[in-house]
Amino acid sequence: MSIPNGKNVYGYADAYAKLANFGQQHLLKYYDELDEAQRAALLNQIEQIDFSVVSTNKQPEKRGRITPIGVTELAEIRTRGDEFFDAGMAELRAGHVGAVLLAGGMGTRLGSDAPKGAFNIGIKRELYIFECLINNLLNVAERVGSFVHLFIMTSDKNDAATRAFFAEHNYFGYAAEFVHFFTQETAPAADYNGKVYLEEKYRLATSPNGNGGWYSSMAKHGMLDIVRRNGIEWLNVFAVDN
């Protein structure tokens, strides 16, 4: 398919060529109706998005082979509980353990338009979900004599608000240099035929890639460099509402 005539705006040809590789040229159908700022926003989004994700999702499903993983049964935990605890504490003292908090959600179902972790659950005093989680980490830090690196996954919707909330509350007493924010990746939203939706004439529809994407999101935002630089070997991953 040839590129339509009259499109001389910088970046259009590159965007069209990229979309053509994935059969997504329809995303430029309203280009002539956009102002310069909207055109720039659309072209930038097209440049940033990995459309191969959509192509991969269109592949026929293959039956997987599920192999049971080894488990530690309750009887063994009761017998070796002290041993396991001491091993964990040793790794913490050595600085080998980091924490990953999945906090990309908003408090909509709680009746709040703030990040879910900023919800006040206190009865007699203010007590925030983030505060409870930080208190748990402070307890660990006190026992092992050092802070644990905390990686907080936010989303495009609540990143700025989450950072501001922590700053406003002075990180609830936690060392700010041990707290690292990164945003959750998004993926283009498509119909059953693999065609990506337009949310607006100048903006593609995207949605978060789910909690399962925490590792790739960490990698994209350079968090794994911090992990390696600090000798972290274990990551404890938990959600803000669990």
Q: Across the structure, where does each feature detected by a protein language model lie?
A:
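Basic/polar N-terminal segments that are highly enriched at the extreme N-terminus
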Residues: 1-17
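Generic signal for short, ordered secondary-structure residues
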Residues: 6-10, 21, 109, 197
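Conserved adenylation A10 loop of the ANL superfamily
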Residues: 103-109
